[in-house]
């Protein structure tokens, strides 16, 4: 097996090089707070920032270091859509419902991009657009039909179809059959974005306490008692923002999200000539299929970040790195021989209906089920949850308190994932033959 690892190879996320995990606030949580936020990712921090700005005393708790989970492990895509493709969503919930949710996804993008701008968060945000690659002619036609349908339904979309003979403008690859150039999408440095949120929450007086897992919660009069190994907190409100890391202390929420491991690699520094050849426009790419691969430049355009094989557990990150390196060089042969400096993993979470969910259950607020669109939608719905907590009429969204399905006997351990991934790959293979 070829040596693909650079001397400085690490299994920490690439993003942590510039944004190490922040120090925790006082390790002993306060005895009281207006709001306890469980989960210190982008969702919880977005809520905490909006709450502290409205005069609430907020404590953010995490079982690990702040932002240890998906918020600093994701691909750093800031998109304008949902995982559920528009045509599929129309078939599932109808044209009116699909149009409403698609427009809400655009609002989520605009809110997150506006937050970066207004808060002056230095996270290398760039409005690059996105190339959605079609692995087959049938998928290209599906992308084309989806675009026509979105335009007919008045969904804000700025896109064009790129036929196979022009795809060299986007990527040095011949494995695709064209794709869709979707403008108005961006990329960020995931670690620095999260770091910026932590800094702003703390500047407003909010506490962010790591290594303090929530082990229990109970109703007490008009509020809650939140139990941790480091003491209890009397809270007026509780917001669960744990997504793929939801603990057993919240069984109702845990039963409704499916944690799925995703994997990424980062290459060594590449020459400007090679970077320009691989991604001529410096634009991120994601495949349009059920088990996609994705590729993007890093924050300064000197490396390639590549991800995929979501849900497939090979037992060790070095083995996963070899698999991803093989996929990367299959897609872009020019990257043959390039070594890796990082391979890492993190958990995304899917809902059973493939849609995000926000609402309140037994008095506890929640927002989760991002289905791999958590940077914009999570930031937005974290803010909207904060507005709901303070009673602001602008809190309402079409995602509030929608039926949040689960399955019989499911308790949060996705024992069925291997077979689900195999089925999705079978569906992809069928589409590839069409």
Map each language-model feature to its residues:
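Rossmann-like flavin
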Residues: 92-200
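Extreme N-terminal leader/targeting segments of oxidoreductases
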Residues: 1-35
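Helical element adjacent to the flavin cofactor pocket in flavoenzyme catalytic cores
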Residues: 149, 177-236
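Glycine-rich FAD pyrophosphate-binding loop
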Residues: 53-73
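Active-site substrate-recognition segment that forms the wall
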Residues: 110, 118-126, 214-216, 232-362
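C-terminal catalytic lobe of FAD-dependent flavoproteins
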Residues: 314-316, 321-429
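N-terminal Rossmann-like FAD-binding beta1-loop-alpha1 element of flavoenzymes
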Residues: 33-60
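Glycine-rich active-site loop/strand segments that organize a redox cofactor
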Residues: 73-104
């Amino acid at each position: 097996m070829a040596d693909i690892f650079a001397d400085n190879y690490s299994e920490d996320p690439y993003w942590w090089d510039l944004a190490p995990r922040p120090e925790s606030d006082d390790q002993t949580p306060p005895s009281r707070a207006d709001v306890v936020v469980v989960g210190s990712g982008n969702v919880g921090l977005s809520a905490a920032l909006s709450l502290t700005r409205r005069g609430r005393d907020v404590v953010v708790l995490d079982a690990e270091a702040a932002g240890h989970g998906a918020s600093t492990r994701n691909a750093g895509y800031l998109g304008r859509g949902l995982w559920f493709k528009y045509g599929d969503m129309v078939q599932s919930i109808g044209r009116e419902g699909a149009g409403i949710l698609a427009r809400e996804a655009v609002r989520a993008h605009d809110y997150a991009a506006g937050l970066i701008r207004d808060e002056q968060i230095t996270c290398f945000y760039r409005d690059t657009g996105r190339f959605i690659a079609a692995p087959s002619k049938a998928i290209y036609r599906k992308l084309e039909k989806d675009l026509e349908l979105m335009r007919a339904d008045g969904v804000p979309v700025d896109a064009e179809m790129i036929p196979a003979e022009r795809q060299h403008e986007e990527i040095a690859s011949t494995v695709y059959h064209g794709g869709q150039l979707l403008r108005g999408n961006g990329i960020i440095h995931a670690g620095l974005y999260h770091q910026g949120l932590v800094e702003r929450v703390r500047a407003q007086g909010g506490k962010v306490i790591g290594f303090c897992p929530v082990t229990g919660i109970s109703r007490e009069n008009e509020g809650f008692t939140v139990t941790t190994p480091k003491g209890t907190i009397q809270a007026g409100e509780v917001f669960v923002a744990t997504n793929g890391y939801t603990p057993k202390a919240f069984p109702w929420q845990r039963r409704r999200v499916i944690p799925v491991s995703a994997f990424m690699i980062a290459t060594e520094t590449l020459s400007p000539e090679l970077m320009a050849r691989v991604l001529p426009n410096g634009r991120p790419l994601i495949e349009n299929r059920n088990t996609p691969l994705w590729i993007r430049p890093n924050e300064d355009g000197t490396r390639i970040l590549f991800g995929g094989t979501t849900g497939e557990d090979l037992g060790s990150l070095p083995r996963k790195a070899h698999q991803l390196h093989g996929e990367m060089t299959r897609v872009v042969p020019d990257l043959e021989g390039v070594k890796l400096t990082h391979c890492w993993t993190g958990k995304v979470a899917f809902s059973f209906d493939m849609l995000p969910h926000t609402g309140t259950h037994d008095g506890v607020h929640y927002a989760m089920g991002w289905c791999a669109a958590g940077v914009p939608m999570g930031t937005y719905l974290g803010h909207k949850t904060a507005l709901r907590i303070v009673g602001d009429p602008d809190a309402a969204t079409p995602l509030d308190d929608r039926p949040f399905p689960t399955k019989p006997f499911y308790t949060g351990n996705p024992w069925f994932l291997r077979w689900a991934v195999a089925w999705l790959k079978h569906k992809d293979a069928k589409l590839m033959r069409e």
